[in-house]
């Protein structure tokens, strides 16, 4: 089986073409391949499939390092777009893909960045999903003997966003896993720790569901900006600095799609005999 290793700001992926190859990945196999000592090593496995819908170019599947399948990965979407162009699976600059949670358009820019239409952020609790009687801009959660104020949103996957004074000293190792599996998130959640520098610039660390803290999380960056705009703390165009680098997020508010722009890097190609 042939594959490529790619990354978006250090958030790394094994990308597999299932259009021209017959592949099957059990959760156990994914865990073995994800191991950084004895396998390929990656945060997520991305699979390129033939479209289920004739209006789409491809179907996009994402698996975490623990073998669980998820509906969205923003950094992965940018790598997906670069991969299908690099491998000659498509020549268009605007690539339409379906996912578990809907549809996306991935656009290659003139400077080889990738702009992803991430769709409209979803704040209704039952769509996140998040257990709450009604939608609020801020929720109070009790976790790890602490009281936490957070925003909750779905970007195709569930996110919880906490504002912190300094990401360097944020209790990511304690609050990340505790909030990820909090009882009010029935499908677990990705946890973002956001430091606001000014209305157009934030710093962010993300503890990803099923993975742990990563160098970057595209959907997490989108979620943080969406929550910041909803809470009237941020403007519509925001630079997000993550440990692995920067992303640029644009959202014009309710009823409009959110756009994420950033890099996608090809590292190497490989072959595995399974």
From Swiss-Prot:
Residues that coordinate or bind substrate? 11, 44, 64, 74-75, 157, 190, 208-209, 218-219
To which pathway does this protein belong?
Answer: Amino-acid biosynthesis; L-lysine biosynthesis via DAP pathway; DL-2,6-diaminopimelate from LL-2,6-diaminopimelate: step 1/1
User: Which biological processes are named by the entry's GO terms?
Assistant: lysine biosynthetic process via diaminopimelate
Coiled-coil region list: none
Q: Where is the signal peptide?
A: none
Known EC number(s)? 5.1.1.7
Active site at 73 (proton donor), 217 (proton acceptor)
Question: Per the record, what are the reactions this protein catalyses?
Answer: (2S,6S)-2,6-diaminopimelate = meso-2,6-diaminopimelate
A Gene Ontology molecular function term of the record: diaminopimelate epimerase activity
Record's keyword annotation contains Amino-acid biosynthesis: yes
Site positions (Could be important to modulate the pK values of the two catalytic cysteine residues) are 159, 208
Q: Where is this site: Important for dimerization?
A: 268
Q: Which GO terms describe its cellular component?
A: cytosol
Identify one Pfam family in the record: DAP_epimerase
Task: Give the domain of life.
Answer: Bacteria
Q: Which InterPro entries match?
A: DAP_epimerase_AS, DAP_epimerase_DapF
Q: Key word Mitochondrion present in the record? A: no
Cellular localization per UniProt? Cytoplasm
- Alphabetical UniProt keywords: Amino-acid biosynthesis, Cytoplasm, Isomerase, Lysine biosynthesis
What biological function has been recorded for the protein in this entry?
Answer: Catalyzes the stereoinversion of LL-2,6-diaminopimelate (L,L-DAP) to meso-diaminopimelate (meso-DAP), a precursor of L-lysine and an essential component of the bacterial peptidoglycan.
Similarity field: Belongs to the diaminopimelate epimerase family.
Q: How does it assemble?
A: Homodimer.
Full protein name: Diaminopimelate epimerase
Protein source organism:
Photorhabdus laumondii subsp. laumondii (strain DSM 15139 / CIP 105565 / TT01) (Photorhabdus luminescens subsp. laumondii)
The organism's lineage is: Bacteria, Pseudomonadati, Pseudomonadota, Gammaproteobacteria, Enterobacterales
């Amino acid at each position: 089986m042939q594959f490529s290793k790619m990354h978006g700001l250090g958030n790394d992926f094994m990308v597999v073409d299932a259009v021209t190859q017959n592949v099957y990945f059990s959760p156990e196999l994914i865990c073995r391949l994800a191991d950084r000592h004895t396998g390929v090593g990656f945060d997520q496995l991305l699979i390129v499939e033939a479209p289920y819908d004739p209006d789409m170019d491809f179907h996009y599947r994402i698996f975490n390092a623990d073998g669980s399948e998820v509906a969205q990965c923003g950094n992965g979407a940018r790598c997906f777009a670069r991969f299908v162009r690099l491998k000659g699976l498509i020549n268009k600059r605007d690539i339409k893909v379906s996912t578990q949670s809907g549809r996306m358009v991935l656009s290659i820019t003139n400077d080889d960045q990738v702009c992803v239409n991430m769709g409209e952020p979803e704040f209704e609790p039952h769509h996140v999903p998040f257990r709450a009687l009604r939608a609020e801009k801020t929720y109070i959660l009790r976790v790890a003997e602490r009281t936490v104020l957070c925003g909750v949103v779905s970007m195709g996957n569930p996110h919880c966003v906490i504002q912190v004074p300094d990401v360097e000293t944020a209790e990511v190792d304690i609050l990340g896993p505790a909030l990820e599996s909090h009882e009010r998130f029935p499908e677990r959640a990705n946890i973002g720790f956001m430091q606001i520098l000014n209305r157009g610039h934030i710093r962010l660390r993300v503890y990803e569901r099923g993975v742990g803290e990563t160098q970057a999380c595209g959907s997490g960056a989108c979620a943080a900006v969406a929550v910041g705009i909803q809470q009237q703390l941020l403007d519509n165009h925001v630079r997000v600095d993550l440990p692995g680098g920067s992303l640029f997020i644009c959202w014009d508010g309710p009823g409009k799609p959110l756009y994420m722009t950033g890099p996608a890097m090809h590292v190497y190609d490989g072959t595995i005999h399974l």
